[in-house]
């Protein structure tokens, strides 16, 4: 048939991608908690979609390590893994610091204004999930300007794990432990100092790992003491 003359109404996203985004947000925010079992039927009822696009989204999330598909045992939200969190943070620190070093010289006036705006916002934000999302947006200004597709893919796979851990343990990533690094990053970007900006990014992720792991160790020690006292 001839090509129609009237504009076609194309969906902005495929249904499976919409479902993926909804599930990803629910996992990262903690609405779907670590270890929680989920079934296709539950998801069909909640999302109002058929099994095929739901299963495609679930398999994609399983490939990212956010969902576990257990043979003969069903599907569940992946447990929190402090070791993986530390590894993801360490990798992001290395990759981002290298990208930021190259990106600083490429920043536009609009980029620098956006960095300053996000820095001001994160400085007065204490809620864990919101703060993590603002920091991600701030880092993304540099990453987007650098335009390296491999780094973009690393970000898409790693940031959800990091944000999820931070959200699940409010206070674990103490804002005071990372604020100095973010202050230094904003100042370096404004001054066009690539080396200082890269160092600030590395310092942010190093401080973040130390903060969360220290909190995790303290909680583990407290649980051990409680168990010993109960024995």
Segments the model singles out, each with a brief description of its role:
Residues 130-140, 144-168, 213-214, 224-231:
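C-terminal regulatory/oligomerization modules of transcriptional regulators
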Residues 121-122, 141, 161-164, 203-208:
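A short structural micro-motif
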Residues 78-146, 157, 174-200:
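All-alpha effector-binding/dimerization core of bacterial HTH-type transcriptional repressors
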Residues 56, 153, 199:
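DNA-binding alpha-helical recognition surfaces that contact promoter or target DNA
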Residues 16, 54-58, 119, 145, ...:
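Secondary-structure boundary/capping motif
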Residues 167-231:
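C-terminal all-alpha effector/ligand-binding and dimerization domain
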Residues 1-105, 213-231:
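Short linear motifs at protein or domain termini
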């Amino acid at each position: 048939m001839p090509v129609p003359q009237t504009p076609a109404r194309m969906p902005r996203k495929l249904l499976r991608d919409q479902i993926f985004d909804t599930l990803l947000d629910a996992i990262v925010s903690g609405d779907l908690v670590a270890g929680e079992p989920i079934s296709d039927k539950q998801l069909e009822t909640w999302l109002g979609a058929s099994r095929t696009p739901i299963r495609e989204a679930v398999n994609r999330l399983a490939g990212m390590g956010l969902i576990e598909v257990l043979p003969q045992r069903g599907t569940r939200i992946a447990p929190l893994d402090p070791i993986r969190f530390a590894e993801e943070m360490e990798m992001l620190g290395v990759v981002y610091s290298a990208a930021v070093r190259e990106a600083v010289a490429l920043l536009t006036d609009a980029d620098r204004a956006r960095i300053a705006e996000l820095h001001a916002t994160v400085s007065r934000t204490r809620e864990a999930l919101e703060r993590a999302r603002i920091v991600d947006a701030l880092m993304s200004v540099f990453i987007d300007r650098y335009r390296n597709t491999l780094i973009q893919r690393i970000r898409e796979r790693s940031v959800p794990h990091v944000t999820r851990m931070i959200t699940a343990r409010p206070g674990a990533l103490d804002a005071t432990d990372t604020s100095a690094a973010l202050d230094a990053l904003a100042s370096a970007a404004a001054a066009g100092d690539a080396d200082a900006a890269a160092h600030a990014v590395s310092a942010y992720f190093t401080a973040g790992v130390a903060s969360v792991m220290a909190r995790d160790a303290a909680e583990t020690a407290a649980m051990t003491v409680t168990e010993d006292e109960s024995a």
